[in-house]
Amino acid sequence: MAAFGLPNFGQLTEAFKKAQQIQQDAQKLQEELDAMELEGKNQDGRVSICLSGNQLPLRIEIDPSILLEGKEKAEIAILEALKDAHELSTSTMKERMQELTGGLNLNLPGIDDGD
């Protein structure tokens, strides 16, 4: 047992190694999220928006037929697709971060909270 309730040197070394591994894994995860293309669509599938795993917009595709239905209809369809893509991207990021931190109870806002 270590003096004064402090962890022994071996425990401290192990904790630092673990922290370094998490940092390396976090960097790798960041790169994986950047490379992802997650597609969201509106209800009828005529508008699709792709975001990266870090919510960066990558591209948008609009079926020309929706433009013939008027500005308001097109705006609604684009917003639906954007919301779908954003939800997919954020949930993917959250899942991957939880895998990375696996049971460490870091209480990271937006990641470890109970939704």
Swiss-Prot record:
InterPro entries: YbaB-like_sf, YbaB/EbfC
GO terms under cellular component: bacterial nucleoid; cytosol
Single Gene Ontology MF annotation: DNA binding
Top-level taxon of the source organism: Bacteria
Localization terms from the record: Cytoplasm, Nucleoid
Gene3D superfamilies listed in its UniProt record: Nucleoid-associated protein YbaB-like domain
Keywords attached to this entry: Cytoplasm, DNA-binding
HAMAP family, alphabetized: DNA_YbaB_EbfC (MF_00274)
NCBIfam families (alphabetical): DNA_YbaB_EbfC (TIGR00103)
Assembly: Homodimer.
Function noted in UniProt: Binds to DNA and alters its conformation. May be involved in regulation of gene expression, nucleoid organization and DNA protection.
Family listed: Belongs to the YbaB/EbfC family.
Name of protein: Nucleoid-associated protein P9211_00201
